């Protein structure tokens, strides 16, 4: 998002020459991140469009998130790279206003999409039957529209407050001179969505864990009932078959060969039942770990990428004596942009349908 840059007009030619290698390295690194973000989000969008199996309301939210992150990559990152390398804004205040508008709106919209996806998954797990009826493309479209509208309402006021102060032609930043504007923008764009995401994913994990345990208990109970029925029917059917055979055996031999066979079968069936139950427990545990890993990656990436930036925004603009270097400000801004690269990876890498769709797209391009 916004950050402070200084002019390099006072630097000598020798100093500029010495700083050139580092500028080239920074430019190439950031350009590579922008290109990767553009490519990966393009793949997600294309996969959802061309793959009929992915035409699901839940994936429409992911597609909209990918579009938002794609806009960050093509409309926000390139201008930021030029600003960082040049160390001054050279494109005029009109372009500055447009860039800041797109920057704040798209980054806010990306964060709010994560909240919408969390809400969608929460309702799909906790109210599966009823929500399956409501989970239509129209419903997904309404959610996406609401996300964009809220993003605009959160993003626009800071831009109006920006013009209340004096701005230099060589800088493109938003100075939060009012505590109200700082709290409004940071809490609306991050802290409130963060709280919502944490609460929803905690409830999702608890609900998924409870659901796994209920299904496991139901399957074990069903197996025990079926096993008892099979055992009783087996005993009844074997009585008539074994009558003539048993009569031919000596009365002094209380244990017939058939009794031994029947005992062996029951023993094997019992062992098989316990083995099957153990395998189901192992699968259930694996699913729980996978669910926890997925949720951990989603929350971890989101918090690591955006929390430092918004802590900086809140502290620096509320505390007059608190300062931060230009390099650190740029780093925190790009750490937030990095979330637009990570989002499509996390939300699709655990989905087999997406993997197959990506493979088909790559083969077609090759």
From Swiss-Prot:
Where is it located?
Cell membrane
GO MF terms here are:
G protein-coupled serotonin receptor activity; Gi/o-coupled serotonin receptor activity; neurotransmitter receptor activity; serotonin binding; serotonin receptor activity
Q: According to its UniProt record, what is one Pfam family this protein matches? A: 7tm_1
User: What ranges are annotated Cytoplasmic (topological domains)?
Assistant: 50-59, 120-139, 203-291, 351-366
- Motif NPxxY motif: where in chain: 343-347
Q: Where does the motif DRY motif lie?
A: 120-122
Q: Binding positions for serotonin? A: 103, 107
The protein's name is 5-hydroxytryptamine receptor 1F
Organism of origin is Homo sapiens
Task: Please name the taxonomic classification of the source.
Answer: Eukaryota, Metazoa, Chordata, Craniata, Vertebrata
Give the encoding gene's name: HTR1F
């Amino acid at each position: 998002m916004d950050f402070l840059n200084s002019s390099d007009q006072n630097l000598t030619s020798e100093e500029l020459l010495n700083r050139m290698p580092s500028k080239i390295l920074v430019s190439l690194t950031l350009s590579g991140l922008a290109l990767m973000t553009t490519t990966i989000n393009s793949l997600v969008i294309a996969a959802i469009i061309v793959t009929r199996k992915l035409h699901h309301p839940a994936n429409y939210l992911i597609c909209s998130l990918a579009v938002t992150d794609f806009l960050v990559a093509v409309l926000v990152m390139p201008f930021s790279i030029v600003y960082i390398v040049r160390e001054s804004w050279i494109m005029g205040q009109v372009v500055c206003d447009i860039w800041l508008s797109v920057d704040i709106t798209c980054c806010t919209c990306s964060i709010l999409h994560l909240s919408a996806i969390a809400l969608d998954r929460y309702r799909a797990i906790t109210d599966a039957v009823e929500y399956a009826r409501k989970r239509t493309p129209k419903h997904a479209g309404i959610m996406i529209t609401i996300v964009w509208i809220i993003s605009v309402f959160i993003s626009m006021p800071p831009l109006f407050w920006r013009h209340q102060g004096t701005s230099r032609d060589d800088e493109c930043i938003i100075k939060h001179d009012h505590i109200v504007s700082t709290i409004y923008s940071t809490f609306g764009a991050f802290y409130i969505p963060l709280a919502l995401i944490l609460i929803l994913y905690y409830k999702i994990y608890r609900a998924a864990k409870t659901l796994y345990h209920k299904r496991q208990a139901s399957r074990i109970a069903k197996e025990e009932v079926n096993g008892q029925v099979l055992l009783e029917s087996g005993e009844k059917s074997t009585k008539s078959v074994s009558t003539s055979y048993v009569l031919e055996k000596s009365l002094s031999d209380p244990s017939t060969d058939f009794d031994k066979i029947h005992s062996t079968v029951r023993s094997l069936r019992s062992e098989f039942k316990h083995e099957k139950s153990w395998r189901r427990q192992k699968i259930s545990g694996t699913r729980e770990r996978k669910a926890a890993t997925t949720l951990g990656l989603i929350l971890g990436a989101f918090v690591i990428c955006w929390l430092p930036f918004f802590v900086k925004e809140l502290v620096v603009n509320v505390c007059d004596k608190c300062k931060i270097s230009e390099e650190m400000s740029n780093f925190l801004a790009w750490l937030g942009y990095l979330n637009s690269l990570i989002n499509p990876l996390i939300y699709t890498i655990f989905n087999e349908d997406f993997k197959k769709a990506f493979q088909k797209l790559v083969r077609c391009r090759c």
